[in-house]
């Protein structure tokens, strides 16, 4: 699987379709981030690198930073699931699906869900931040899924590059598929 991913990273998108240009609208994911990408992912990773997938805002429900409500809720509809933002709902659904499909395709990938929906201290054990930090420090690759590119305050879809490691070929491929942030 990693060799296949590397081949895809070298030739373009996994779908064989040209990537959506920055600022353009993808029919599935919406607008791509128009921000200029100022990095290149060149670091090669082990073919069996452990990948941790997390749902954005999974540990911040009911407090500042809980994710966007979404267009339907802003227009008066009820949230998709009581007690969580619509963004968090989709983050959970997609992060779990990514891990499940990745496992079916032979990737060393797992989904992480915090023990609580509200953890005020972002550095506390069990938060996405602390789990992702520890996972990458141990040599793994961590990815947090977000769907907050909605409305006038949204920037658009894209990969926010890692803060603590050199940019990798996985980062580069994800940026080609979904857009990139500087």
Where on the chain are the PLM-derived regions?
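Conserved acidic residues
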Residues: 139-140
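Solvent-exposed loop/turn segments at secondary-structure junctions
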Residues: 57-60, 115-119, 147-153, 165-166, ...
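N-terminal secretory targeting signals
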Residues: 1-47
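Generic non-transmembrane alpha-helical segments
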Residues: 97, 101, 173-182
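A short, glycine/acidic-enriched catalytic loop
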Residues: 67-82, 148-178
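Active-site histidine-acidic residue metal-binding/catalytic motifs
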Residues: 32-131
